[in-house]
Amino acid sequence: MQKKLQVEAIEHGSVIDHIPVQQGVKIIRFFNLTQTNEKITIGLNLATHTGQKKDLIKVENTFISDKQANQLALFAPHATINQIKDFKVVNKFQVQLPDSFIDVLACPNSNCISHHEPVDTRFYVKKKSTLKLKCHYCEKTFDHLFFSELD
């Protein structure tokens, strides 16, 4: 059986692979990738070699930083980042869930002081397996799904 690319190759840039189904569009929104002039290719519900489905994002002429890669773990904890130069993978790494997120997310608790005072939001990762985050200020713990729709 001949292999066939489901999404066009890029010359230079980043490929975010192994994104869970229905998370690709959320990642595009979260990172404001629609605000760039670079070509963005997104594959949704692509078949994997195991017969499962995944999403995939390719961003030309843009390289994902370590900080951005770690933020991706909120949406895709098993995603990999491929850095492409001259159509070849020059670096490949898996996202790593950081111990904390600073000034990335808004607290879902509307009574949290972070909504009323000029402070940077701060969340600590309390449980990595099911991804639970604890707010530094109100000390409430939230499932990561509370954050998946935030802009």
From Swiss-Prot:
Question: Which keywords fit this entry according to its UniProt record?
Answer: Metal-binding, Pyrimidine biosynthesis, Zinc
Q: Which SUPFAM superfamilies match?
A: Aspartate carbamoyltransferase, Regulatory-chain, C-terminal domain, Aspartate carbamoyltransferase, Regulatory-chain, N-terminal domain
Provide any one GO MF term from the record.
Answer: metal ion binding
- Note the InterPro entries from the entry: Asp_carbamoyltransf_reg_N, Asp_carbamoylTrfase_reg, Asp_carbamoyltrfase_reg_C, Asp_carbatrfase_reg_C_sf, Asp_carbatrfase_reg_N_sf
Cofactor dependence is on: Zn(2+)
- Superkingdom is Bacteria
Where, in this chain's numbering, is Zn(2+) bound?
C107, C112, C135, C138
Q: How is the cofactor bound?
A: Binds 1 zinc ion per subunit.
What NCBIfam families would the database entry show? ATCase_reg
Name of the protein: Aspartate carbamoyltransferase regulatory chain
Supply the source organism for this entry. Psychromonas ingrahamii (strain DSM 17664 / CCUG 51855 / 37)
Q: Taxonomic lineage of this organism?
A: Bacteria, Pseudomonadati, Pseudomonadota, Gammaproteobacteria, Alteromonadales
